[in-house]
Every structure is written in C-alpha cells, then in structure tokens.
C-alpha cells in the first residue's frame, strides 16, 4: 500500500480528488495537507468581491472532497520538505512520510519591495483577502489578470482604485482592451510605475510620489514557496520545481509538481493546472500499476476570460480578442460547471 501525500488543494489536486471520488485509487493510502477546510475558487474571486456570488457559491469544501476521494484531510501548513528522507514537516511539528508526493501548493506574490510584507495585504491566500478587504480607497500593485480583475471588481463595489503596473501585463489587442476597460471604469491606472516601498498608513511610495490609502493589495507576479529551495528537490532559477514531461521532479521521480509551484514553461494559470490534474489522475493509477506514465502536452494558446467588474468580460485566445456580456455569462457557466464537479457525489463505492 503506497503512501500518497498531496500537499495543497489547488486546481490540479481538486481535479484529482474529484476524479478519485468517482473511481477510487486502489493500492494507495491518500492524505491531503491544506490549511483551509473550505477554499475559494480563484476564478470566482472577482465575482465574489463584486457581489455577483455569495461566499458559499464561490468556495468548495476541501475536507468533504477529500473524504469522497477516500483521502485523510490534514488542516495544516507545511514548514519544510526533506526529499532525501521522503518527509514533510508541518508548522505544528508533526512529521509525515510518503512514498509518492504530489505538490500543488501554489505560490506567493513577490513581496521583496520594502514594507510590502508588513503593510500590504497579499492577494493569496484568497480566504484571508476576502476576510480583510475593507476601505474606500484601495491601491493594487500588479496589473496582471488578477490585479486588473480585482481593480474592476472593487470599482464595481464603489471603491476608488489606483492600479500600479511596472510593466505591461498584456500585449497587442488584449492589452488595449484591458487598458480601455480600466479607463472606462475610472480606475486610476498607472502603467510603467513601480511601487518602490510601502510605509505604515499604508502609504505607497512610487518614484517621488507618496500617497496614502485605506488598503494596499499586493498582486504582483508569483514567487516560489520558500521551503522548496531547501527541500533538496531540483528547482529552476526562480525556485519552482523542475519537472519532466510527466510532471515528475527531474531529481526525485517520486515527487510530482503541478500548478504554480512547478516550472513547466507555461504561464502560471488555473487553466493549465486543471489539465495537469487530469493527467495526474491517470498517471497515479499507472504509477501504482507499474505501467509507463503519459506525458503532459503543453498548451500555448489557452482561453482567457477576464471579468470587468460588472457582468461583462474580455475573451482572448492567441491573437483573437472580443468582449461583452456574453463573455461573462460564458465564464460564469464554465465556473459553475467546475464547482458542480467538485460537489458531485461519488457514483461508486469501495467494496
């Protein structure tokens, strides 16, 4: 009986657990470690903030999903990983051993700017963000898809929003549509302006300008979780786990890495993580059975649906872009279908 340890309840592991709830993984003892028994689905976070969804519509029960997949749920954070001895240490001091380790623990916003960690509110974890989000004048550092969607969701809620973007997050027609959407909603968009520091207040320092806000949200690009660097698992220059074509660690084949914490060559997106989770569901069965694993087919032209506060969205794939209310309803259908899958009761039982 192989001990399979799942760290994190991101998109990939959610898909994996939903699959195992329908068809159990025989020959394995599963354990899931994640800090939150209930988790907000990231794609529905802007809609939750904008008021289009209730909290219960935008979150799923991690503990219940694990139970349906016959996995033991451990509500805890990871302190360290020692790949040499195949052990994970939790923040409360407990130690867990594994035969197979699957990492889908996400990332953290880059917070190397002075004062960002102390005086700004990181976008992740979403649960803490939603519980701590208040104020009428909010600054957001980072104008990627997450930052832009948050800015427009908060503006829809009536907040004054200033959005700082050091570098263009989108190119071409998509970039023009996003910037136009921000301007139309009277968001104070400041492209090419880096946040140099955050001081108590909170006060944002950008160049020679100093401005006080009720809240500063930190939505910059993803940074690797610190404990990966000391794990012994091979990582890339940014600290993300290097994986082969089957999403296994190049240094430790008993370790899988998926989603934000993996270095796959793709953009760090939930769309890709979902596909990785579907592959993992099949490859864990193959690993237990001792048969060759399937390779992951990377996707260069994933669909992007970016919400704009109201029930309106921008759609893009490759060089094609469009926008309208229809795009929001399309995204709403996709997201609700996803949540329904995570809540679906199992159709099979262990005999």
Task: Identify what each model region corresponds to.
Residues 310-351:
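C-terminal auxiliary extensions adjacent to catalytic cores
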Residues 73-81, 88, 96, 158-245:
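A Rossmann-like FAD-binding core segment of flavoenzymes
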Residues 128-164:
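Rossmann-like NAD(P)H-binding beta-loop-alpha module
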Residues 261-309:
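A conserved FAD-binding loop/helix module that cradles the flavin
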Residues 7-9, 103, 141-142:
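Conserved N-terminal Rossmann-fold NAD(P)-binding element of oxidoreductases
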Residues 3-4, 68-137, 217:
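FAD-binding core/adjacent interface of flavoenzyme oxidoreductases
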Residues 116-136, 202, 210-275, 282:
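FAD-site-proximal beta/loop scaffold in flavoenzymes
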Residues 1-71, 149-173:
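Beta1-alpha1 glycine-rich phosphate/pyrophosphate-binding loop at the start
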């Amino acid at each position: 009986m192989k001990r399979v340890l799942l760290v994190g309840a991101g998109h990939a592991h959610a898909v994996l657990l939903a699959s195992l709830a329908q068809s159990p993984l025989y020959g394995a003892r599963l354990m899931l470690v994640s800090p939150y028994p209930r988790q907000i689905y990231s794609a529905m976070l802007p809609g939750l903030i904008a008021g289009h969804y209730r909290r219960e519509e935008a979150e799923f029960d991690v503990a219940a999903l694990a139970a349906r997949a016959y996995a033991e749920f451990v509500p805890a954070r990871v302190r360290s990983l020692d790949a040499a001895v195949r052990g994970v240490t939790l923040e409360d001091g407990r130690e867990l051993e594994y035969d197979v380790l699957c990492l889908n623990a996400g990332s953290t916003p880059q917070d190397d700017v002075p004062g960002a960690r102390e005086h700004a509110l990181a976008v992740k974890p979403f649960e803490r963000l939603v519980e701590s989000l208040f104020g009428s004048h909010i600054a957001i550092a980072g104008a990627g898809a997450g930052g832009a969607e948050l800015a427009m969701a908060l503006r829809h809620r009536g907040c004054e929003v200033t959005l700082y973007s050091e570098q263009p997050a989108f190119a071409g027609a998509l970039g023009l549509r996003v910037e136009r959407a921000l301007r139309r909603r009277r968001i104070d968009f400041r492209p090419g302006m880096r946040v140099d520091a955050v001081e108590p207040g909170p006060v944002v320092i950008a160049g020679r300008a100093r401005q006080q806000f009720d809240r500063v949200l930190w939505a910059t690009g993803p940074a690797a979780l610190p404990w990966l660097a000391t794990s012994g698992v091979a990582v890339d220059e940014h600290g993300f786990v290097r994986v082969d074509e089957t999403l296994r660690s190049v240094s430790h084949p008993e370790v899988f890495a998926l989603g934000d914490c993996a270095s796959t060559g793709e953009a760090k997106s939930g769309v890709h993580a979902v596909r990785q989770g579907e592959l993992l569901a099949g490859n864990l069965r193959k690993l237990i059975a001792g048969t060759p694993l399937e390779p992951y087919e990377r996707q260069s032209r994933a669909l992007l649906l970016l919400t704009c506060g109201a029930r309106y969205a921008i759609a893009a794939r490759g060089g094609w872009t469009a926008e309208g209310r229809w795009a929001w309803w399309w995204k709403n259908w996709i997201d609700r279908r996803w949540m329904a899958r995570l809540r679906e009761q199992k159709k099979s039982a262990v005999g």
